[in-house]
Amino acid sequence: MPLYEHVFLARQDASSQQVEELTTQITGVITGLGGKVTKTENWGVRSLTYRMKKNRKAHFVLLNIDGPATIVNEIERQERIHEDVIRYLTVRVDEHEDGPSAMMRKADRDRERDDRGGGFRGDRGPRRPREEPAAVVEE
């Protein structure tokens, strides 16, 4: 069966519990039509590049799907109807990535940077006083 990566964006006003319910609803549709969800990742609330339907932020969710094309048609139809879904995108892939997706790796990398101390530079001493410019002597 073909493999798909499906990402949908839910309104920021929706609680994380509502997003989880929406994810389980979509997963139920997929399994009901003979497919299976191999991986589900909730990327959390992220800022959007531009406003979509009066929203500046959204919940991002990734689903790796293994199933026929009729599944994609049905979940996209249901997401078009659902008021909490802002956008969705389904891409056919040759194979699914093992381990975390690129977005999750980026989030882990950002957390590691925060562990390094952020912007605190306590090891540096105080600033040196500015030197006065040399006096110009005119003859």
Curated annotation (Swiss-Prot):
HAMAP family noted in UniProt: Ribosomal_bS6
What is its biological role? Binds together with bS18 to 16S ribosomal RNA.
One of its Pfam families is: Ribosomal_S6
Q: Which UniProt keywords are listed?
A: Ribonucleoprotein, Ribosomal protein, RNA-binding, rRNA-binding
Q: Which InterPro entries match?
A: Ribosomal_bS6, Ribosomal_bS6_sf, Ribosomal_S6_plastid/chlpt, Transl_elong_EF1B/ribsomal_bS6
GO BP terms: namely: translation
| Sequence ranges of Basic and acidic residues compositional bias | 97-133
Region Disordered: start-end pairs: 97-139
Q: What is this protein identified as?
A: Small ribosomal subunit protein bS6
**GO CC annotation:** cytosolic small ribosomal subunit
What organism, scientifically named, is this protein from? Nitrobacter winogradskyi (strain ATCC 25391 / DSM 10237 / CIP 104748 / NCIMB 11846 / Nb-255)
UniProt keyword annotation of Ribosomal protein present: yes
Specify whether rRNA-binding is a keyword of the entry. yes
**Gene Ontology MF annotations:** small ribosomal subunit rRNA binding; structural constituent of ribosome
> What's this protein's family per the entry?
Belongs to the bacterial ribosomal protein bS6 family.
